[in-house]
Amino acid sequence: MARPSRDGYDRGMKALVLALCLIATPVLAQDVAGRFDYYVLSLSWSPSWCATEGDKSGAEQCAAGRKLGFTVHGLWPQYEEGWPADCRTTAKNPSRQETAAMADVMGSGGLAWYQWKKHGRCSGLAAKDYFALTREAAKRIRIPEALSAVPRDVNLPAKVIEDAFIEANPGMQPQGITVACRQKALQEVRICLTRDLQPRACAPDSQRDCAGSFLMPAPR
């Protein structure tokens, strides 16, 4: 069988590279800092995270006696379909002091640093402004009294938690909150907000709840 000429091989490789670039370009073009549609405020249920991950690594937020309930996992820029991550930005990274200062709402400075790298850079904000916005978003959401101090482990369906948040936060709508589970335990509550932190409906790809009942372990 005749071998292809070197010129023919080069032309074929150039065509392949061009095709791959045309496929990849729309994806890469999406993840530009500051270009997104809304935010998701993710509130992690610390007892579940500590039981599955944090205790094993000796995480700061899982220290004995802290008895943390809901903490901020992150404030995530979202598209109406999908989400950006690890965006390129000219914003400077936060100092260790700035990330450590977020431990009171996020559980640890390490998590604040990770969230900045993956999500904060996509906000188009300076690090200090992104953390200030994260803190403000958390401040605007009232944790239902019944869920702020769970005295013992309980099994609940997602709707009970959603209804409690909606009742405690006027303006929040059923389509604007989702409950996520992991290993049959409550993982997080995710609340959709406009760019100026007003309640809004989540995009369809973010409206996924836990199926059935799940464990909500008590803080310890």
What residue ranges belong to the model's regions?
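N-terminal signal peptide c-region/cleavage motif recognized by signal peptidases
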Residues: 24-26
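N-terminal module-boundary/linker segments of secreted carbohydrate-active enzymes
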Residues: 30-50
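Domain-level detector of nuclease and nuclease-like folds
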Residues: 40-42, 54-220
